[in-house]
Amino acid sequence: MKFIITLFAAIVMAAAVSGFIVGDKKEDEWRMAFDRLMMEELETKIDQVEKGLLHLSEQYKELEKTKSKELKEQILRELTIGENFMKGALKFFEMEAKRTDLNMFERYNYEFALESIKLLIKKLDELAKKVKAVNPDEYY
């Protein structure tokens, strides 16, 4: 009887130690799935911001012609929203890129995302400066 209890205890200990040494693969799978979904969502949001930037560029051309104060304020609001969203994403992805458990492909994805976000912030900021430089006509 002592032998069976000792054997059972040894099996339980071996299972616990092997689980500790090998690690929990399910956690890695969940983390990889989360990373993949996060990158897909980021790609969608970047695409939306790029389309918004294109639309705002067209509105800027109209602003140059009409010099409308309301249009200027609307463009600046939308640029501020897009820029703040991208700055928040930049902080998050800078933090995530420092993780040590990333493989080569994941690290590349994070670095590519960081550079894409930085470029979008730069473009949004440039357009905001152009819009701010337009003096609205108060007579319309």
UniProtKB/Swiss-Prot annotation:
Subunit structure: Monomer. Homodimer.
Keywords, ordered alphabetically: Allergen, Cytoplasm, Endoplasmic reticulum, Secreted, Signal
Applied biotechnology: The Pichia pastoris-produced protein seems to be well suited for in vitro immune cell activation assays and for in vivo applications such as immunotherapy and skin-prick testing, because it is properly folded, free of endotoxins and has the appropriate allergenic characteristics. Non-allergenic peptides identified from the mapped major conformational IgE epitope-containing areas could be used for the engineering of house dust mite allergy vaccine.
Localization in the cell: Cytoplasm; Endoplasmic reticulum; Vesicle; Secreted
UniProt signal peptide: 1-19
UniProt record similarity statement: Belongs to the mite group 5 allergen family.
Name of the protein described by the UniProt record: Mite allergen Der p 21.0101
InterPro entries, per database record: Mite_allergen_group-5/21, Mite_allergen_group-5/21_sf
Tissue/organ expression: Expressed in the epithelium, lumen and microvilli of the midgut, and in feces.
Origin: domain of life: Eukaryota
Temperature sensitivity of activity: Thermostable. Upon heating, unfolds only partially even at 95 degrees Celsius. Upon cooling to room temperature, almost completely restores its structure, indicating high heat stability and refolding capacity.
Pfam families: Blo-t-5
Region Immunodominant conformational IgE-binding epitope, annotated ranges: 20-53, 108-140
GO cellular component terms given for this protein: cytoplasm; endoplasmic reticulum; extracellular region; vesicle
GO molecular function: protein homodimerization activity
Record has Transferase as a keyword: no
Keyword Heme belongs to the record: no
